[in-house]
Structure formats: structure tokens, C-alpha cells
């Protein structure tokens, strides 16, 4: 169905709020979240719309890539198919250093699988097995967020467990 695949990496420097429309709750526009995990995300349709708006090009080329405008949407589909944007790393305040990038083993495993499907050469293995308790955080050897064998993120303290794979993943992402 597709000739090519690529992965788009988004890095936000300011707070991002991709609202999910309306809600019956106290929050007017709750953030978009994955149904299965509850993780924050940006739905593909909103991402594709933003990309289309950002393109300042020949209208005919825009129509070929993104499809016709709303009034003629049934004419044909665009050539570009966009997936949901998902969180890979999340900045969290750290006692040692300003902040730490955090993620989970599940997020990393899914990212690796999707990156390989997009044709990227992923030369690191997922971190595992999972810690036996919730009070452990995997860190790279020599990590700047470790103080006295502990990692303090927001108000939560974890025992630092050095893991070579963390450094491998960080190097690959650079």
C-alpha cells in the first residue's frame, strides 16, 4: 500500500496541549490520550492538518500530498498517511540537575518496533527485565540525575539501577 515510510520526531520547547474536544467533566478541553494506555498523544488528523497548514507551496502539490480541501474531500485521498504522535520521552523535574527525560519499558519496546517497521536501523535492545518493585529507576552509568544512589523526580524517590542499554538508547536518539 505504501512505497515509503518515515518517522517524524517532534520536540516541543513549550507546553503543548492537543485538546480532545469537549468533556462533561470539570476540565473543558482534556488532553488527547491513548485509550489503551492513557498516555498523552496527538491524533493523526490534527497532526496532518498542522503539517498541511505549515506548508507554503504550490496548491496543486499540497492537494496531491494532503488531499483536497474539506469541500472536495471525497474526490480522492492524499498521498501522505500520518499516524498518531506518541510520547517517547517526557521531561520531569529532577533534584539533581534541572530535569530528567523519563520513559517506560513498554514505550521503548513499542517505539523500537515501530521504528524498525519504518525502516530505521535500531541497534539497541529493549531494557529488561522489569524491576521487581516500583521504587527502582534504570539510569545510564554516570547519569547526572543520580545523587547518592538515588533518583528524585518531582516528589518521588527511586533507587538508581545502572543499565548499559539506557546509554545505548540515548546515543541512538542523538
Residue map of PLM features:
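RNA-binding basic/glycine-rich loop and surface signature characteristic of RAMP-family CRISPR effectors
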Residues: 1-174
Amino acid at each position: 500500500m505504501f512505497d515509503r515510510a518515515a518517522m517524524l520526531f517532534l520536540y516541543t520547547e513549550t507546553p503543548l496541549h492537543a485538546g480532545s474536544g469537549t468533556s462533561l467533566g470539570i476540565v473543558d478541553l482534556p488532553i488527547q490520550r491513548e485509550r489503551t494506555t492513557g498516555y498523552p498523544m496527538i491524533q493523526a488528523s490534527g497532526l496532518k492538518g498542522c503539517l498541511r497548514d505549515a506548508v507554503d507551496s504550490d496548491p496543486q502539490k499540497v492537494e496531491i500530498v494532503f488531499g483536497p480541501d474539506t469541500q472536495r474531500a471525497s474526490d480522492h485521498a492524499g498521498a501522505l498517511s500520518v499516524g498518531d504522535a506518541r510520547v517517547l520521552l517526557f521531561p520531569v523535574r529532577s533534584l539533581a540537575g534541572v530535569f530528567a527525560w523519563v520513559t517506560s519499558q513498554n514505550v521503548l519496546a513499542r517505539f523500537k518496533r515501530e521504528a524498525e517497521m519504518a525502516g530505521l536501523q535500531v541497534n539497541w535492545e529493549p531494557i529488561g527485565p522489569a524491576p521487581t518493585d516500583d521504587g527502582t529507576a534504570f539510569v545510564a552509568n554516570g547519569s547526572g540525575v543520580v545523587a547518592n544512589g538515588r533518583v528524585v523526580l518531582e516528589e518521588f524517590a527511586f533507587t538508581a539501577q545502572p543499565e548499559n542499554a539506557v546509554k545505548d538508547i540515548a546515543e541512538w536518539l542523538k
